[in-house]
């Protein structure tokens, strides 16, 4: 349900943060 979607977006957000850190 909605909780799973929240977790997916949280994981996506973390991945984006890691990618941004790696690019800099």
UniProtKB/Swiss-Prot annotation:
Tissue specificity statement from the Swiss-Prot or TrEMBL entry: Expressed by the skin glands.
Function: Possesses antifungal activity against C.albicans and is also active against E.coli and S.aureus.
GO cellular component: extracellular region
Family: Belongs to the frog skin active peptide (FSAP) family. Pseudin subfamily.
Keywords on record: Amphibian defense peptide, Antibiotic, Antimicrobial, Fungicide, Immunity, Innate immunity, Secreted
Pfam families in alphabetical order: Antimicrobial19 (PF08225)
InterPro entries: Antimicrobial_19
Lineage, uppermost ranks: Eukaryota, Metazoa, Chordata, Craniata, Vertebrata
Chief place of localization: secreted
Species of provenance: Pseudis paradoxa
UniProt-recorded name of the protein: Pseudin-1
Coiled-coil portions: none
Subcellular location: Secreted
GO terms (BP aspect): defense response to bacterium; defense response to fungus; innate immune response; killing of cells of another organism; xenobiotic metabolic process
């Amino acid at each position: 349900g909605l909780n799973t979607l929240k977790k997916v977006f949280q994981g996506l957000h973390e991945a984006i943060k890691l990618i941004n850190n790696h690019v800099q």
